[in-house]
Amino acid sequence: MKRVFRKVFPLRKEPTPVPSLPENIEDIRQKALKGHHLEIVQWGQVLLDSVYVPKDPASALEWFTIAAKAGFGPGHNMRGRCFQFGWGCDQDLTEAARCYEEAAKAGDEWGRYNLGILTMRGIGQPQDLPKALDLFRTAAQNGHAKSMNLYARFLEEGWVVSQDRAAALDWYRKSAEGGDYRGQHNFATALADAGKIDEALDWWRKAVVDATSDILLAMNQKLVLLGEKRDTALETRVQRRLQELGVPVPNSAAIRPA
């Protein structure tokens, strides 16, 4: 009897089933599957960190790469984020800088900002303050709030540019109005230094919602130094947020005017 040999193929791994998603998230996924560049990046961001699906940074990077290969700036920017922080890949700061460079060339302001940060600090490439200034200035002029804040800092300090504190204040204001908590804190600080305490407090109240620990600590110090004009309710909010972040709250009595 003739024996029949059958070629055995390995079983293909079944794709991980996608849980039931809210309508807006499912719409993003479907558009991503159809090749829409914006939704490709958005779906990658869902996979990167979302309550709707299990975190899958490696798959997120694959989606960002698809968008980047299509020349889509936000795709390059998110690839840069992955390489900068080691999301779904080994950390590679040089590659992160290259991705941000591509994002900036494609006109993505977040990519321009992120490249500016690395360039300013000499991360993944040699430090180049004139280049960083140019990146922040361009992104600021194009409406990027975080870049407005850093462009203002260059102007305030006179870093590789003529010092212009009036222009710096104007850019801090624009950054604050654009919703950047660092810009809001810096603008509030300038207002307080000019004696415009009520206006300053209004901006600090906005900043406290999203501020990171470094800004919260600086804000707490400024609030304590207001003395009789201080807003104790706002101080309490700032200190509560620091506690939530696991940051020790400085003793107010230890904070003294410089």
Language-model segments: which ranges?
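Hydrophobic face of amphipathic alpha-helices that form TPR/SEL1-like repeat modules
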Residues: 42-49, 78-85, 112-121, 150-157, ...
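Boundary/linker segments of alpha-helical solenoid repeat arrays
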Residues: 73-74, 107-111, 143-147, 176-184, ...
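Terminal, low-structured helical/coil segments at or just beyond the last alpha-helical repeat
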Residues: 3-8, 215-258
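Short helix-capping/linker turns of helical repeat alpha-solenoids
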Residues: 34-36, 49-51, 69-73, 85-87, ...
